[in-house]
């Protein structure tokens, strides 16, 4: 975990995420923080399709770039006193955030992305969502989402929210092991399911997960409940969890519309930092 990419729009929420990233970098022994701001000089009016009657608004790209760089420099100056041994670089680009991040992952050899998430009303979540949520939906890399009211504390207790079907279909376990080897935290494994019991395939998954994680001496917890998100958040509160780890499986358009993503709901509804691993 040498390089951490921190996304910022210079809001208080983004500042909190950047401060958390500095703290996290120390525990992960990361050597570099890259502060990144994506701005758009071309932006459609009211987020509707461009037509001859409703043209796009074009801002002065040079002015936007200068302002972005100035704000990034201020942010770096604010963070550096608490970032001993960590290099803080800055980067600003005129691009769509999700596209820019995808390019930077390989170009800058990024190991982890950190973004803030502001609390929103249910209507705002439905209508506009969040940059962080959109990045999560498109990501193929580890992403930490930091709620605006998250506490900045050492990673002493970590909760791994397990969905066996998602783990079985994906390749997240290797990334999970790398994270666990880095943070050296007390591990709680939580699976929330209804009382229908486990299939023979799931029982094999459980056995495999025990074998994989036993060296971390985790606490395995199997909870019967139909509300997965509430159960996980309640468990996190009761056990003073420092971070929740969840595996996110990207879905097609129809699945996105008709299925609820537990990882997305956790991002919206938890006040604990959430580490998303791609399935």
Residue ranges and their predicted role:
Residues 146-154:
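Flexible loop/hinge segments that line or gate small-molecule binding clefts
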Residues 23, 40, 77-113, 214-264, ...:
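Structural beta-alpha unit
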Residues 1, 109-111, 141, 155, ...:
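Local beta-strand N-terminus motif with an aromatic residue
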Residues 55-70:
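A short acidic, glycine-rich active-site loop
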Residues 121-122, 167, 252-254:
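Short glycine-rich, flexible loops that bind phosphorylated cofactors or substrates
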Residues 97-147:
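Hydrophobic alpha-helical segments and helix pairs
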Residues 1-56, 157-222, 238-241, 269:
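Small/aliphatic-rich secondary-structure junction motif
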Residues 128-131, 203-206, 258-263:
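Charged helix-capping and loop-helix junction motifs
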